[in-house]
């Protein structure tokens, strides 16, 4: 990208900032949304973070999506059929839809997007969601045929993932690799500007295909990293919605009669992976001991202010095909006994890294450090920022990695068991390929996960996914911690704006009232 291009973009952004101050038009029905971090890219195919994909929902849509309860819904698709061999998906498209640049959304546009997403040469971060596609064909303007390399029964759920959006082919041709700065989609709002430290601005798209929507004139997405500042913007009325709300401030905001505090159910699972290829974590008794050593109820009280529930399995309960187990009980005596049996009567020393450095992560690290010390395990803790995580955890394979204990979380935005299990537990998902930071490998789990994708029979899938979860729960490659509740707050004047279980937002029906 040239210096001139960067300067031009920043000049445009500065002009928009000035317009926001000088022009009363922006204040008509502008919802200001304060979020917890900056955005990495406005190309959902090349973004790994949920916030970037949430913002992209302003201007982009996919063929399918999820409602607020993570139930699959049609969006730009009207219907679909699957061939008897599970290889071909024929999708009928909604007629009369236009991109923001005036070009038609049609089967040819779907082909362009899926060809781009499934081509490994493009090196897009979300390639794994589309790598099973063999070819995409435009049958006619409103019919697209997608052929897979092998049966993959979770494919429609993958197409409902927030990465699987439809970008204007004309814009892709015009901007190429710069499309992340020039989004053009079919969504309710049109992109205006991105000031990369201060805001993303979108405005109502007058040609939106759903009558009567959107109701807001514009949305300003503001990254506000500091927890106190984010909450303060809400209290002063400078923002109408804020997420995440720091758990320790929830009770303060709850007392403000102009605000609504909402604790939503989630599929955000928190855990500590243990690198099972390294001593002492190659010993299952050590892994079991560490699960017994952590008081999950106390952790939830201390770190999450009660806004979480103990993990009841490898999957959150609301994920399709999840199996519910009894949480690992707190039993430090049992933990010490298991460590002794494993050959570590005096414990051991190791490291604990975190994928985030915010206040909740810091509390989890400190609490875990104290709990493990009580059974003789001494840990040195490091809270990482996004750059460190990408380099040291996601970017290194089993021979180079320094990962031992790693605190992180996962939200399976397809709503289905495959995306909640395969990236985290399959042998093929060891970093840097995907996110199996435990470097866990169980041939039967691999077989179960592969076979579950070859069948569309729900009973058979349930049996296979249950067997995989049974083995993962018993093998304990993680310290299974908690499933978070998602705490947001909003002005009572803002309606129809909420956090979904996968941590993305729903706001198509959002409105501001006086």
From Swiss-Prot:
Please state the gene responsible for encoding this protein. gsiB
Q: How does it assemble?
A: The complex is composed of two ATP-binding proteins (GsiA), two transmembrane proteins (GsiC and GsiD) and a solute-binding protein (GsiB).
Query: Does the keyword Signal belong to this entry?
Result: yes
Leader sequence residues = 1-27
Function according to Swiss-Prot or TrEMBL: Part of the ABC transporter complex GsiABCD involved in glutathione import. Binds glutathione.
Q: Which InterPro entries match?
A: Peptide/Ni-bd, SBP_5, SBP_5_dom
- An example Pfam family from this entry, by short name, is SBP_bac_5
Cellular component terms per the entry's GO annotation: ATP-binding cassette (ABC) transporter complex; outer membrane-bounded periplasmic space
A biological process (GO) of this protein is:
dipeptide transport
- Cellular location(s): Periplasm
A Gene Ontology molecular function term of the record: peptide transmembrane transporter activity
Family statement: Belongs to the bacterial solute-binding protein 5 family.
Q: Which organism is it from?
A: Pectobacterium atrosepticum (strain SCRI 1043 / ATCC BAA-672)
Look up the domain of life of the source.
Bacteria
Would you tell me the protein name for this molecule? Glutathione-binding protein GsiB
Q: Which NCBIfam families match?
A: PRK15413.1 (NF011942)
This protein's major location comes to periplasm
Keywords, A to Z, come to: Periplasm, Signal, Transport
């Amino acid at each position: 990208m040239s210096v001139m291009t960067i300067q031009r973009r920043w000049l445009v952004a500065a002009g928009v900032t000035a317009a926001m101050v000088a022009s009363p038009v922006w204040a008509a029905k502008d919802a200001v949304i304060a979020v917890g971090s900056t955005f990495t890219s406005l190309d959902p195919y090349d973004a790994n973070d949920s916030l970037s994909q949430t913002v992209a929902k302003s201007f982009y849509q996919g063929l399918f999506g999820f409602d607020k309860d993570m139930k699959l819904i049609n969006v730009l698709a009207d219907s679909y059929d699957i061939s008897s061999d599970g290889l071909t998906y024929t999708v009928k498209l909604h007629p009369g839809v236009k991109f923001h640049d005036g070009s038609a959304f049609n089967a040819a546009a779907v082909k362009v997007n899926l060809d781009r997403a499934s081509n490994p040469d493009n090196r897009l971060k979300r390639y794994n969601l589309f790598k099973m596609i063999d070819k995409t064909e435009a049958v006619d303007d409103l019919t697209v045929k997608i052929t897979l390399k092998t049966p993959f029964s979770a494919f429609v759920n993958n197409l409902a993932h927030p990465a699987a959006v439809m970008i204007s082919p004309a814009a892709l041709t015009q901007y190429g690799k710069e499309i992340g700065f020039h989004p053009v989609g079919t969504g309710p709002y049109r992109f205006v500007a991105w000031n990369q430290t201060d805001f993303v601005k979108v405005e109502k798209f007058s040609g939106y295909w759903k009558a009567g929507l959107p109701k807001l004139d514009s949305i300003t997405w503001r990254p506000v990293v500091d927890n106190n500042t984010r909450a303060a913007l809400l209290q002063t009325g400078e923002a109408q919605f804020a997420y995440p709300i720091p758990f320790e401030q929830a009770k303060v905001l709850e007392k403000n009669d102009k605000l609504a505090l909402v604790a939503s159910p989630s599929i955000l699972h928190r855990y500590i992976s243990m690198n099972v290829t390294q001593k002492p974590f190659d010993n299952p008794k050590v892994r079991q001991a560490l699960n017994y050593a952590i008081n999950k109820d106390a952790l939830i009280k201390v770190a999450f202010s009660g806004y979480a529930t103990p993990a009841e399995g490898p999957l959150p309960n609301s994920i399709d095909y999840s199996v519910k187990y009894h949480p690992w009980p707190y039993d430090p005596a049992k933990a010490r006994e298991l460590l002794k049996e494993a050959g570590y009567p005096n414990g051991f020393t190791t490291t604990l890294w975190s994928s985030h450095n915010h206040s909740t992560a810091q509390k989890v690290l400190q609490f875990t450090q104290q709990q493990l010390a009580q059974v003789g395990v001494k840990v040195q803790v490091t809270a990482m920022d996004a750059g460190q995580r990408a380099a040291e955890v996601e970017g290194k394979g089993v021979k180079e990695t320094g990962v031992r204990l790693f605190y992180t979380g996962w939200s399976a935005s397809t709503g289905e068991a495959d995306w909640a299990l395969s990236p985290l537990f399959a042998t093929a998902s060891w970093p840097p390929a995907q996110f199996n930071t435990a470097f866990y490998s169980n041939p039967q789990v691999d077989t179960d996960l592969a076979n579950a994708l070859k069948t569309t029979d729900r009973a058979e899938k349930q049996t296979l996914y249950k067997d995989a979860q049974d083995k993962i729960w018993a093998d304990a490659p993680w310290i299974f911690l908690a499933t978070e509740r998602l705490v947001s707050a909003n002005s009572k004047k803002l309606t129809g704006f909420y956090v979904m279980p996968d941590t993305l937002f729903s706001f198509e029906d959002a409105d501001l009232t006086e």
